[in-house]
A protein has these predicted regions:
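Flanking scaffold residues of small Cys/His-coordinated metal-binding clusters
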Residues: 215
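Local cysteine-cluster metal-coordination motifs and their immediate loop/turn environment
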Residues: 218-219
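Interaction interfaces in information-processing and related assembly proteins
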Residues: 2-212
């Protein structure tokens, strides 16, 4: 299955949602840059986010456009670290402390620049914090890369859910309850769920409407 992302709304426009499957483009990036497993996981998470919102980060850089084209590189592609306390790739340790900068060129005289500190280095949590503090948009960001023992990419993808201004307390509560019970995004992908199925699982009871599907690729 080729990589792609979808855009959707739910709860009569009170929720905006994006979901993507990015295994092929993350594997392409891994092979192109000869990255270690933890570097692949870090870069892959940000590449996945880039297909949905286009960030740029020092040391780990991704650029993306509205057509689903994305590219990126790692400042230290050979970084190797032991697993974290949960036995997972230590992406937070590899990314370290720093600043997340998001630069958006939307056709104005100057690009929009938003910047926040890295709160964890796990990337999804950092982007959630960025949306809340820099863009004042309550969001849930989930990103994941699952590696094979042969250092190839088994699964990659993610989703972004955002509450729109004026979202009701009922919608907020329902979304929070659903998010709390979700499996990791790589587990959902490894079970054969595509982006549509993932958003259906999260927002199917809230009037999910899929707006469009966009192919994504490393370029």
């Amino acid at each position: 299955m080729s990589d792609y992302m979808i855009r959707a709304t739910a709860a009569e426009g009170q929720i905006r949602a994006f979901a993507a499957t990015t295994k092929e483009l993350v594997e392409y990036a891994r092979a192109a840059h000869n990255t270690s497993p933890v570097a692949t996981a870090a870069l892959g998470r940000l590449l996945t986010a880039g297909t949905m919102m286009g960030p740029m980060m020092q040391g780990l850089t991704v650029t993306a456009d509205s057509q689903g084209n994305v590219k990126g590189y790692v400042g230290n592609p050979e970084v190797m670290l032991p697993p974290n306390a949960k036995g997972k790739l230590d992406v937070a340790g590899a990314v370290g402390i720093g600043v997340l900068s998001v630069i958006k060129d939307i056709g104005l005289k100057e690009p929009y620049v938003g910047q926040t500190i890295l709160v964890s280095g796990e990337i999804a949590e950092d982007l959630t914090y960025y949306y809340a503090t820099s863009e004042q948009t309550p969001s849930c960001v989930a990103l994941g890369v699952l590696m094979n023992k042969t250092n190839t990419v088994r699964q990659a993808g993610g989703f972004i859910l955002q509450l729109m201004p004026g979202a009701s307390e009922e919608v907020v509560s329902a979304l929070e309850t659903k998010i709390a019970s979700l499996a990791p995004v790589t587990s959902m992908l490894d079970q054969g769920m595509n982006p549509e199925a993932i958003l259906q699982d999260i927002l199917g009871d809230m009037g999910l409407e899929i707006m469009d599907q966009i192919p994504v690729q490393f370029h």
